[in-house]
Amino acid sequence: MRKNQISPYIKTSKIKNFTMNFGPQHPAAHGVLRLILELDGELVRKADPHIGLLHRGTEKLIEYKTYIQALPYFDRLDYVSMMSQEHAYSLAIEKLLNCNVPIRAQYIRVIYSELTRILNHILAVTTHAMDVGALTPFLWLFEEREKLMEFYERVSGARMHAAYIRPGGVAQDFPLGLWNDIMQFVEQFFWRLVEVEELLNGNRIWKQRLVDVGIVTAEEALSHGFSGVMLRGSGIAWDLRKNNPYEVYNKLNFNIPIGKNGDCYDRYLIRVYEMYESLNIIKQCLTAMPAGLIKVNDKKITPPERTDMKYSMESLIHHFKLYSEGFNVPENETYACVEAPKGEFGVYVVSDGSNKPYRCKIKAPGFLHLQSLNSMSKGHMIADVVTIIGTQDIVFGEIDR
């Protein structure tokens, strides 16, 4: 037998790629994500997400509830940005009812939508940084996040699942002192953001882990159906607050930050700059907010005040009927969407003329973003998968529903 010739008795086989599970118990999975990774050494060849571990049948449950009873389900979808989802649902019901929300209520809704955006981006940026190895931003910004939770609690009584934005307006007006406290927060939080930027923006390790990782071109972003930060990070200036304004956004002056490289670092910067813009929007709203009603003056849609119920039998009856039977919505169908912190959150409602929705389809931005995890991770190291999951800012409440 020649020197370099392989013996016919030796069996040769090609080395297969190594397959491993990532999650669902992994701390960097941000919930119940199960990834099946196909690895070629340290490089990712395929990432297959397995979802459904947090499925609760929300859309079906809503069909068995009145329009008011269905509202709290929306807080429990993306449980990091609660009021944004209530907002989309309320807009859809108001379209079907053809009712106009009072201007003060619109300003309050915008203030709380932007506070929710900050609430979400604080969690997104700090947990992303912590996944990569930076603990300090988490400790700094969660102190600020606690203040935002207090603002939630002061208007609704709940720190997370507020059920504050309701069809026809908001649950109650600002309590005494809240206006001043939000204004003070806006002034102080600006400088805390500056400190976080000083810590991360030029940090060598942070940039090594994020720059040129998870690049998505503008064409890819559109074909995947991206929205929100994931779309703007690829250089497309699309924001529903500008492109399809709702409430009082058309009366406000603010900028839309967009990226140019479509990588994780660009998306991090956009989230930080969006927090600056949210502070600017909140300040404008607090200054321009007029006095007036905070819910539609129609007792068939919104409940009467507690003080009225003590003296008026009619108000008591309205209140009882509203919470026991709800209100009938004219037979029709509509789609309403808001620029939620994670992207376009939409609600498609079909009414059959009864007091319960015939169908309620929820469009969650995170579902579309997670689909692209395979293409974004391909060719990267296994450690970069953690960075990409962090930059997608996914929450499984809305993905699994």
UniProtKB/Swiss-Prot annotation:
It is an enzyme of class 7 (translocase). Its main location: mitochondrion. It catalyses: a ubiquinone + NADH + 5 H(+)(in) = a ubiquinol + NAD(+) + 4 H(+)(out). SUPFAM superfamilies: HydB/Nqo4-like (SSF56762). GO terms for biological process: mitochondrial electron transport, NADH to ubiquinone. This is NADH-ubiquinone oxidoreductase 49 kDa subunit. GO terms for cellular component: mitochondrion. Belongs to the complex I 49 kDa subunit family. GO terms for molecular function: NAD binding; NADH dehydrogenase (ubiquinone) activity; quinone binding. The keyword Transport applies. It is found in: Mitochondrion. HAMAP family: NDH1_NuoD (MF_01358). Keywords: Electron transport, Mitochondrion, NAD, Oxidoreductase, Respiratory chain, Translocase, Transport, Ubiquinone. Core subunit of the mitochondrial membrane respiratory chain NADH dehydrogenase (Complex I) that is believed to belong to the minimal assembly required for catalysis. Complex I functions in the transfer of electrons from NADH to the respiratory chain. The immediate electron acceptor for the enzyme is believed to be ubiquinone. Component of the iron-sulfur (IP) fragment of the enzyme. Its EC number is 7.1.1.2.
